[in-house]
UniProtKB/Swiss-Prot annotation:
Keywords: Chemotaxis, Cytoplasm, Endoplasmic reticulum, Hydrolase, Membrane, Protease, Thiol protease, Ubl conjugation pathway
Distribution of this protein across tissues and organs: Expressed in head and tail neurons. Expressed in the amphid head neurons ADL, ASI, ASH, ASJ, ASG, ADF, ASK, AWA, AWB, AWC, and in two tail neurons, the phasmid tail neurons PHA and PHB.
InterPro entries, per database record: Papain-like_cys_pep_sf, UfSP1/2_DUB_cat, UfSP2-like_N, UfSP_MPN
Role summary: Thiol protease which recognizes and hydrolyzes the peptide bond at the C-terminal Gly of ufm-1, a ubiquitin-like modifier protein bound to a number of target proteins. Required, with oct-4, for the localization of a subset of 7 transmembrane domain odorant receptors, including odr-10, to the cilia of olfactory neurons AWA and AWC. Operates in aggregation behavior, and responses to oxygen levels.
Membrane topology, record value: Peripheral membrane protein
Location, primary (coarse class): endoplasmic reticulum
GO cellular component: endoplasmic reticulum; endoplasmic reticulum membrane; nucleus; perinuclear region of cytoplasm; protein-containing complex
Protein name per its UniProtKB record: Ufm1-specific protease
Disruption phenotype: Aberrant localization of odr-10, str-2, str-112 and str-113. Reduced response to odorants mediated by AWA and AWC olfactory neurons. Increased aggregation and response to O2 levels when knocked down with npr-1.
Result, substituting W469A: Strongly reduced ability to hydrolyze ufm-1 bound to a target protein
Binding partners and assembly: Interacts with odr-4.
E.C. code: 3.4.22.-
Residues the record marks as active site: C421, D545, H547
Length: 589
């Protein structure tokens, strides 16, 4: 998708505007009105750069859990995007327990799609003012309540192969997805460690609740049950009377057609809630598999229609900010950087995600399956400050916003003890930009950092491969050269002045959220947060120390002060300090 304004992902199939009366009050549903208002604001934030959209009619889709009477997502869309094909794409990307439950009527205009049980009555003024009371007055069948995130994630990797004829790829992709859906009953999911099996059950076994001990109190982004997918060659036919069941048919043609073989490894993820029966889990596993296949089909067809040919995809699972369920996408892997950026912009609009920061970079995907974790985990400790216990705040705490990796002396087989602390602080900062979706470029090595400084003529050629120190200025130069990032500076004449600038640091963590490199007294450290009492002036700094030379032992790192809250006296009163505050771009998606 080369244009973020493309109307639909598959086809137009647009619904005509209708005016719908309020639904009868016969059941009580739950909705998080603030989350709905935020989604509306996110979509409208895209229109600020497009004058043609400012007055365009807006409608939307309401997705939820019918059995629990919960609205999970209210996704707003401009009129041209209110299509059945987009509804199918959105649903195929959501958790397998979530489906279309309603439609929207905004200022008397609505686009009704089949499957909705009710229509939310909204006004532009209500949405812009975030008026919960007005919403509840107009929608008496709803309670405003934050829906809790719950359930374990069942995850498995399933491979499937499609053969696509030259000139008929779209037709063959759709047919292949339909065949996969029809054959999904053949899949059995096995966890040998715990003796768990998810499969089609006989009636007497269908109500067993054998995952309750795993799903009680679980949350889907960290409590994972991994399954191996196995395909049955036959269905259980013990109660059938026919002699012949499913018979495979092979049709051979000799027309010299060129075929493209498309192999996809899809990550199938579905939730297990406390109280689910084995039948619930089996149905959900089939639905999750079908959604992966359909999502793959839609992205592939879209690529063909856009003239990119048959594209390979990879599975990615996300927990976007403010969401209480997971988002599952098949993302193209061979598109250009610009094509992928335009596609991400498109997805941000469809899912009402922020327009000002990345959410759907591959580096931001959850590593739920062990194979995904193996490919993404370099055995670095992530966010060690979250493992600090028994700290008593002295005032108001503000910290780094988003994940980062702890880089320190002696990693990567490099003995940089005594000279590499600023390089390691730089690498920690760079990891933040990777893990928060601002870049896909790997963390630079010491040599690559040195080469960048030579390239901008800050250092001579002999600097590359040396053991010379770098400081705060060099760090800002390299961030600008390699990532085109701007940095703010705080310069102080003593450690006492570092404390005086604590309000600036707090504001930085609140607005920008990046780690801060501080250099002085021939040492470099990384500041991850501040704790400031505005009444007493007492201040503490959350410091990550790159001088650590040990193994990746989180207990040692947090208990021995390598990642810890430090008093103001930690900064020497006899030395000056310079701080580098990297600024994330405001238009990166």
């Amino acid at each position: 998708m080369t244009n973020s304004q493309t109307v639909s992902l598959i086809g137009p199939t647009q619904m005509a505007p209708q005016s719908t009366p309020p639904p009868p009050v016969n059941e009580l549903w739950f909705i998080d009105a603030q989350a709905m208002f935020q989604n509306y604001a996110n979509l409208r934030s895209f229109s600020k750069s497009n004058a043609n959209e400012i007055n365009t009619t807006i409608g939307g889709f309401v997705f939820g859990r019918k059995a629990r009477k919960q609205v999970i997502h209210v996704l707003f869309a401009y009129a041209e995007d209110l299509t059945e094909s987009n509804r199918q794409f959105l649903e195929s990307s959501l958790s397998a327990d979530i489906e279309l439950v309603g439609n929207l009527n905004i200022d008397g205009q609505s686009q009704i799609l089949p499957g909705g049980q009710f229509t939310l009555q909204l006004t532009s003024r209500m949405l812009e003012n975030r008026s919960i009371s007005e919403f509840l007055d107009m929608n008496v069948m709803f309670n405003n309540e934050h829906v809790l995130m719950e359930g374990a994630s069942c995850v498995s990797r399933v491979g499937y192969e499609w053969s696509l004829r030259a000139g008929r790829e779209q037709e063959d992709v759709k047919s292949a997805a339909e065949r996969l859906s029809m054959a999904s009953f053949r899949f059995t999911y096995l966890n040998a460690e715990h003796g768990l099996v998810i499969r089609e059950q006989k009636p007497e076994a269908a109500q067993q609740k054998y995952l309750d001990k795993f799903s009680k109190g679980a949350v889907p982004y960290k409590d994972v049950i991994e399954f191996t997918a196995m395909q049955s060659l036959t269905r259980d036919t013990s109660n059938d009377t026919e002699d012949q069941k499913l018979v495979p048919t092979v049709k051979v043609t000799k027309d010299n057609k060129h075929f493209t073989r498309l192999v996809t490894i899809g990550e199938v993820v579905f939730p297990a809630f406390f109280g689910d029966s084995s039948l619930d889990l089996y149905k959900r596993s089939r639905e999750a598999f079908n959604r992966r296949a359909n999502n793959t089909m839609m992205v592939t067809v879209n690529g063909i229609r856009a003239g990119r040919g048959v594209t390979t995809t990879t599975s990615a699972t996300y927990l976007p900010p403010g969401w209480v369920s997971l988002l599952h996408l098949q993302l193209p892997t061979k598109w250009t950087d610009n094509e992928q950026r335009n596609y991400r912009i498109r997805l941000h609009k469809l899912f009402n995600l922020p327009s000002s920061k990345p959410v759907l970079r591959l580096s931001q995907a959850l590593a739920l399956h062990s194979e995904s974790a193996r490919l993404t985990n370099k055995k670095l400790i992530r966010e060690p400050h979250l493992s600090i216990t028994n700290y008593q705040p002295v005032g108001e705490i503000t910290t780094v916003n988003g994940p980062y990796n702890y880089h320190h002396y002696m990693q990567d087989g490099i003995d940089d003890s005594g000279w590499g602390c600023a390089y390691r602080s730089f690498q920690t900062i760079w990891s933040w930009f990777i893990l928060n979706g601002y870049t896909d470029k790997p963390v630079p090595s010491h040599r690559e950092i040195q080469q960048a400084l030579v390239d901008i003529q800050d250092k001579q050629a002999k600097f590359v491969g040396s053991r010379q120190w770098i400081g705060s200025t060099e760090i800002s130069f390299v961030l600008n050269e390699l990532l085109k990032l701007e940095c703010r500076f705080i310069a102080t004449n003593s450690g006492a002045e570092v404390v005086e600038r604590v309000r600036e640091l707090a504001r930085h963590f609140e607005t920008s959220g990046t780690p801060v490199m501080i250099g002085g007294n021939m040492l470099a450290h990384t500041i991850l947060g501040v704790d400031f009492n505005d009444t007493t002036g007492e201040t503490k700094f959350l410091v990550l120390d790159p001088h650590y030379t040990g193994s990746e032992d989180i207990k040692t790192i947090t208990s021995k002060g390598w990642c810890a809250w430090k008093p103001a006296s930690f900064w020497s009163k006899d030395h000056f300090y310079n701080m580098v505050l990297p600024q994330p771009p405001s238009d990166a998606i």
